[in-house]
Amino acid sequence: MAAAAAAMATATSATAAPPLRIRDAARRTRRRGHVRCAVASGAAEAPAAPGARVSADCVVVGGGISGLCTAQALATKHGVGDVLVTEARARPGGNITTAERAGEGYLWEEGPNSFQPSDPVLTMAVDSGLKDDLVFGDPNAPRFVLWEGKLRPVPSKPGDLPFFDLMSIPGKLRAGLGALGVRAPPPGREESVEDFVRRNLGAEVFERLIEPFCSGVYAGDPSKLSMKAAFGKVWRLEDTGGSIIGGTIKTIQERGKNPKPPRDPRLPTPKGQTVASFRKGLTMLPDAITSRLGSKVKLSWKLTSITKSDNKGYALVYETPEGVVSVQAKTVVMTIPSYVASDILRPLSSDAADALSIFYYPPVAAVTVSYPKEAIRKECLIDGELQGFGQLHPRSQGVETLGTIYSSSLFPNRAPAGRVLLLNYIGGSTNTGIVSKTESELVEAVDRDLRKMLINPKAVDPLVLGVRVWPQAIPQFLIGHLDHLEAAKSALGKGGYDGLFLGGNYVAGVALGRCVEGAYESASQISDYLTKYAYK
C-alpha cells in the first residue's frame, strides 16, 4: 500500500503556459523590497543568434525542458547534431523559473520545485556538466498530510504502516486486503483514479493519501483523472498481476530474469527515495543545455506555419527579431503545449488538431513566502527545526492551498539563517477562480491556511517573495487521454505526415523526470526515422 501510494505521488509538474501578470494591489502582508511577480507572455525579444540556419535534420519546436533535452539526447546518444531548437519566448526552460535575492540569501522556484533523480535525469545533468551542482534531499525527511487539523506523517515504507496515525486500523486492514486482491474485480472500463483506489485500497487511502497527492501532483480532480494514463505503473500492477501485491511480485520476478545493463559509472548514487535539484536551482539545467547547444537554440522565434515539403521533410516559417525566416527540416518534433500545437497543426490535419485541443490545463499559482523560524508552531518542529519535504492538503479539510513545500528544509542555501522559506501551490481543477484573484488575495489565502496548521496564528506577517500564476499550468490526464493522444498521432500518420512527432509533458507525463525520459524516447524515434528514411 505504501509503495503504491508513493508511486502515485512522485511527479512534479514540468511545463506550463506562460504566466499571467497579477495587477498590483494593496496588501495586508508586510513586504520588504521588490516582490517578484508573474511576467506576462511576450517578454522582450532577444536577437537571434548570428548565422541563421535554413535547414536542419531535426527542428525541435519549443525550448522548454522537453525540447532542450530532446536536442541534447539527439546529439549525445544518437550523433544527430544538425538540430535547431526554436522558442517563441525570450528565454529557454519553459516554466522552470528560479528566482533569487542574492543579497538577502533567498533562492526559490516559481514553477516545478524538484525532480526524482532517475538515471535518465542524472545522465542529462552529467552530460550538461552539472554533476557537481546536483543537490539531494534527505531521503528520511518526512512528508505530511493535513487531517483533522493536524499535520500527520505519511508512511515512507511498509514498516511504517502499523505506526502512523493518518489511517484507522480498519482502514489499514481494508487497504492491505485490497492490495492482496480481496476486492471487487476491475469493471472492464477505464477507471478514474478515485474509482481505482477506492476499489483496491479503500476509502481512507483515497481520501487521506491519494486525493491530496493528486492535488499536489496534477492539481487535478481524481474523479476525472485516468488511473491508466496518470499513474500507469500502479495501474499495470493490477493489470499484469491480478492485484497490486501480485503485480509487484511479478515485476520483481521479471527484473530478476532480465537484469538491467551496467549503470553508467559517471552517475552519482542517491541515497534512498528522495528528490533533487541543482545548487542554484532548476534553471541551471535548461541554461546549461542552451549554452552547450549554442547557436542551435533560437529564442524569440515564433512559428507561424508548417507545411509538408515536396522533397520530403517540412518547411517551417518563423517570425523572428530579424524578420521572417524559413527553415527546411527532415523531421520536426513539437514539444509545445497541446493547445498551441493544435492551432499550428490545424492546416495540416483538423483531426489531429481537434484531438489535441481536448486536453485541459487548469490554472495554478505558486506563492512563495518566508517567516522567521520562531513563527513555526512548536508541535511542527523536529529537534527544534522545520524538517521534511512539505505537506499536502485534502480538499475535504477546509483549506484552499493545495500544499506547501518546505523549500529551506529540502535543499541548502534557500533562505538566510533564522528564516524558513515556503513554496505554496493554490488553484487547480477544483479551484479555477484563482485567475480572478489579486496578488494580495492569493497571499492572504495562503497565509490564512498556514496559520491553521503550521504557522503560529499570532506570528508576524510573511515576507512575500513571489506570486506567479500559470493560467494553463498542468495537462490533465483525464479519462480518455491516451485515446485522444493516439487519435492525434494516428491522424498525422494517416495524413502522410511521417517524421512529425509530438512530445512534451502531455505526452510523456507531468513530472520533470518524465519529461526528460520522454525526451530520450523522442530522440530515439527521431534517430530511427532519420536512419531509415531521411538519410537515404
Curated annotation (Swiss-Prot):
Keywords: Chlorophyll biosynthesis, Chloroplast, FAD, Flavoprotein, Heme biosynthesis, Oxidoreductase, Plastid, Porphyrin biosynthesis, Transit peptide. It catalyses: protoporphyrinogen IX + 3 O2 = protoporphyrin IX + 3 H2O2. It comes from the Eukaryota. Binds 1 FAD per subunit. Its EC number is 1.3.3.4. GO terms for cellular component: chloroplast. The keyword Lipid biosynthesis does not apply. FAD binds at residues 62-67, 87-88, 111-114, 510-512. Residues 252-266 have a biased composition (Basic and acidic residues). InterPro entries: Amino_oxidase, FAD/NAD-bd_sf, Protoporphyrinogen_oxidase, Zeta_carotene_desat/Oxidored. The keyword Oxidoreductase applies. One of its GO terms (biological process) is protoporphyrinogen IX biosynthetic process. GO terms for molecular function: flavin adenine dinucleotide binding; oxygen-dependent protoporphyrinogen oxidase activity. It is found in: Plastid, Chloroplast. Residues 1-36 form a transit peptide. PANTHER family: PROTOPORPHYRINOGEN OXIDASE. NCBIfam families: proto_IX_ox. Belongs to the protoporphyrinogen/coproporphyrinogen oxidase family. Protoporphyrinogen oxidase subfamily. This is Protoporphyrinogen oxidase, chloroplastic. The lineage of its organism: Eukaryota, Viridiplantae, Streptophyta, Embryophyta, Tracheophyta. The gene is PPOX1.
